[in-house]
Regions:
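Histidine-rich, glycine-flanked metal-binding segment
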Residues: 2, 9, 13-57
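Metal-associated gating/positioning segment near the N- to mid-region
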Residues: 54-122, 140-146, 210, 241-242
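Histidine/acidic-residue-rich catalytic or RNA/ligand-binding cores of hydrolases
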Residues: 71-75, 144, 199-200, 236-243, ...
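Active-site mouth loops of central-metabolism enzymes
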Residues: 76-89, 154-175, 225-227
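Divalent metal-dependent hydrolysis catalytic cores, especially in the metallo-beta-lactamase
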Residues: 90-116, 127-136, 185-196, 225, ...
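Histidine/acidic residue-rich metal-binding segments in metalloenzymes
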Residues: 172-246, 250-270, 292-312, 360
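His/Asp/Glu-enriched, well-ordered alpha-helical/loop segment
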Residues: 221, 295-379
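C-terminal cap of metal-dependent C-N hydrolases
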Residues: 348, 354, 367-410
Length: 410
C-alpha cells in the first residue's frame, strides 16, 4: 500500500477539485480508496507521500501520436534516414521521455509495431501504455501510398514487420483490416481525405462509401475501434455515416451541423490535433501551410460547435512530424480555442480513456482503476501550461509503479 495525502485532487471526470485529498494505492497497482483525507482509513504502517500544496491528477493521455516518426522528409518517412536499429533505440528513448513528461497512455496512430509493447512487458524499456494502429489504411494514391514528387514510389512498408496498408475495393479493405489485426493492431486507423499534398487536399475523398462501410464493419467484427483521418468534404461525411469511433482532425466539421449531431448520437469522438496544424501553418510544405492557414479559424469554430453539440472532444497531438515530448502543448491550444482548463484536462484524461475504450481502467482517479497518477507543482486549472514544464512534473506513476520521483529529493 502507498498513500498520497494533502494534495488538491483533479479526478479527470470534471468534478469539483478536492482539497486535502487522500488516494490509497494497493499492491496490485490499483486505487484502493479516494476521498477527503479524513474519510480514508490508512492501513497500519502504510507509507505516506505528503503532496500538500501540489496537484494530484490522472496520468495524461494522447489520443493521436506517432512515436516512430521524426519529421516529414521523404527519407525519414520511407525509413531510409538511419538503420532500423538506430530508429528502435530512438523510439525507446522517446517513449521513456513521454512517460516522464506525465503521459501514461498513448494511442499511436501509425507505424509502431507490437514489439514495443512486448519490450515493455519484458522490462526491456519503459514508456506509456500503448494502443497501436500498426499500419494505417488508404487506397492506392492515398496518404499511406508513399510516392515522391519526382514519381519515385515505395512499394513496401518501411517496417517489414507491418503490412503495407494499401487496399482498394471492399473485399481488399476487409482483407487488409484482417492483416493489420494479425499484426497486433488495437485500433484500425485509415485515411479518408488527404492533406498538404498537391494531389490530395483535406477535402479530397479517399475511399467510397462501400469501402468505408466494409472497413468499419470488419474492424468492429474483430472488436477494434476505428479512427479516421478526415479534414472535411465527402470523405468526412462518408466516415461519420459509416459509424467510425473517432474523427482525427475534422477541421471543417463545423460546416456540417448534421454530422456533429450524428457524432454526438453515436458516441464518436473528435480529436482535433491543434498542435500539428500549428506546426503546418508555419513550417509545413507549401501545400500544408496553405491549407493549415486556411482552416485555422474553421478548426477553432469546429471544436466550439462540437462541444455545444455534445461531441466529446479529446486531446491528441499528431506528434512525430516535428517533435516529441511536449504533448501537453495541445491542452494549451485547446484552451486558446475556447475550452475551459477543466474541459481540456478531461479531454486528456477521462474522455481520452473513453476514446481508447479504456475508461473502465484508466483516465480518472476512482476506486478500482489502475493507479496511473501524476503530481504537479502548480494548478493546471489556473495555468494549463504548467503541464509543459517537466521540472514541475514531480511524480509519475503507472499501474502503481513510480517511474519519476522528484518529491523524495525535496
Amino acid at each position: 500500500m502507498l498513500a498520497f495525502i494533502g494534495g488538491n485532487l483533479i479526478d479527470g471526470a470534471g468534478g469539483t477539485p478536492l482539497a486535502d485529498a487522500a488516494v490509497l494505492v494497493n499492491g496490485r497497482g490499483r486505487i484502493e480508496a479516494v476521498g477527503p483525507r479524513g474519510a480514508v482509513t490508512l492501513p497500519p504502517n502504510c507509507p505516506v507521500v505528503n503532496v500538500t500544496g501540489l496537484t494530484l491528477l490522472p496520468g495524461l493521455i494522447d489520443c493521436h501520436d506517432h512515436l516512430t516518426s521524426f519529421g516529414y522528409e521523404f527519407i525519414g518517412r520511407w525509413g531510409l534516414a538511419e538503420p532500423r536499429s538506430a530508429r528502435v533505440l530512438r523510439v525507446a528513448k522517446v517513449m521513456e521521455e513521454t512517460l516522464l513528461s506525465g503521459y501514461t497512455a498513448i494511442r499511436d496512430c501509425g507505424w509502431l509495431d507490437v514489439g514495443y509493447k512486448q519490450a515493455m512487458e519484458q522490462g526491456l524499456i519503459t514508456g506509456p501504455r500503448l494502443q497501436l494502429a500498426t499500419s494505417p489504411l488508404s487506397p492506392t494514391q492515398g496518404t499511406q501510398d508513399r510516392s515522391s514528387p519526382s514519381g519515385h514510389h515505395q512499394p513496401t512498408s518501411p517496417d517489414p514487420n507491418l503490412p503495407r496498408g494499401i487496399a482498394d475495393g471492399p473485399d481488399a479493405v476487409r482483407a487488409m483490416v484482417r492483416e493489420v489485426v494479425r499484426a497486433g493492431a488495437d485500433v484500425i486507423k485509415f485515411f479518408n481525405t488527404g492533406f498538404g499534398r498537391a494531389t490530395q487536399s483535406g477535402s479530397t475523398r479517399s475511399y467510397d462509401p462501400d469501402e468505408v462501410r466494409a472497413l468499419v464493419d470488419e474492424a468492429h467484427i474483430h472488436g477494434k475501434t476505428v479512427a479516421c483521418h478526415a479534414i472535411g468534404g465527402p470523405g468526412l461525411r462518408t466516415a461519420i455515416e459509416a459509424g467510425v469511433d473517432s474523427i482525427e482532425h475534422g477541421c471543417l466539421l463545423g460546416q456540417e451541423p448534421d454530422l456533429l449531431k450524428m457524432m454526438a448520437d453515436q458516441g464518436s469522438y473528435l480529436v482535433p490535433t491543434f498542435t500539428v496544424f500549428t506546426f503546418h501553418a508555419t513550417q509545413g510544405n507549401s501545400h500544408a501551410q496553405a491549407e493549415a492557414q486556411e482552416f485555422r479559424q474553421q478548426h477553432i469554430d469546429t471544436v466550439q460547435q462540437a462541444m455545444l453539440a455534445g461531441v466529446k472532444v479529446v486531446a491528441g497531438t499528431d506528434a512525430g512530424g516535428w517533435e516529441h515530448g511536449n504533448n501537453a502543448k495541445e491542452l494549451e491550444l485547446m484552451v486558446a480555442a475556447g475550452m475551459t482548463p477543466m474541459q481540456a484536462l478531461v479531454a486528456a484524461t477521462g474522455w481520452a480513456a473513453g476514446c481508447l475504450g479504456l475508461d473502465d481502467s484508466i483516465g480518472t482517479v476512482e476506486t478500482g482503476k489502475s493507479a496511473d497518477l501524476i503530481v504537479v507543482d502548480g494548478d493546471p486549472l489556473a495555468d494549463i501550461s504548467v503541464l509543459q514544464d517537466k521540472n514541475r512534473i514531480r511524480l509519475v506513476m503507472k499501474d502503481g509503479q513510480v517511474y519519476l520521483d522528484r518529491l523524495s529529493s525535496d
